[in-house]
Amino acid sequence: GGEVITISASDPNGCHINALDLSEGYGDGKEPLVMKSEFIMSLYEQLMGADKIEPQEKSIIDRSVGNIYREYLKNYQGKPPTLKNLYDDLMKQVNPEAHRIALALELFTVGSLNVFSHQTNINTKSRILCFDIQDLGENLKSVGLLVMLDAIYNRVIQNRREGKYTHVYIDEIYLFFANGSGSGHSITNYSSEFLYKCWKRFRKYGATLTGITQNVEECLLSNTARMMFANSEFLLMLNQATTDREQLARLLGASDTQMSYVDNAPAGHGLIKVGGAIVPFANELPKNTELYRLMSTRPGEE
């Protein structure tokens, strides 16, 4: 069976996912704390903004991460730490900079937006999981996407240990790159890099990761996203704006003739790139079918 997990900051008694959950085998099982520390940096960056995270802050956070995971990593028994534990550890330090970081995180740890600072209270063992973060609001949506990806990463690791294959789909993947600057560098660098690591690692973990977006322009501003486009074995393109077509053509080595298939293309028409081959496709679903009724999202169609 499947389960829809709706995460909302406005429901204190609703679903919670611990942002600091850590499965045995996390990060290849060799240096789990290293990758988890990188994830927490990503989380902090999303919460506070990349322009507010300094080298000394990174060192302080890394130290606290080691402190709060020390006991749990001995045997992975009991409950993993939470963001509240991170907040408490930062407040215990004598360094005033640590207190400043803790206060900056207070809203998201002990304040009204603490939805990810609780122990996980949902069933993550269902065969199909759908994480719904629509109700999180703008302050937490990008953070929610990152926490969901980490939760999925933990599940992929568990499935691998049990010999199960995993299919992962991320809608609105552009949010990982939404603050990309015109220079081609992502402001949310840790977040996009964490996604890129998952993009590369999931395959050897027995999983496929598929990203979906209508905002390819945001992605093309990020060097990380461009590498993901260029190195993806499978790419499906529907109708594209003129500037996006030009950039995609250069990135993928596609000809003008090929790119014409995503110029004013009708619904269900476009290009598929598989390995080194790029071919046009048409996939029109008859409107008088049950499948069309189930899959259509057009207003007024039931």
What are these regions (language model features)?
Residues 213:
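H-loop/switch region of ABC-family ATPase nucleotide-binding domains
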Residues 1-2, 7-11, 15-207, 220-223, ...:
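P-loop NTPase motor domains
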Residues 219-302:
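C-terminal regions of RecA-like/P-loop NTPase motor modules
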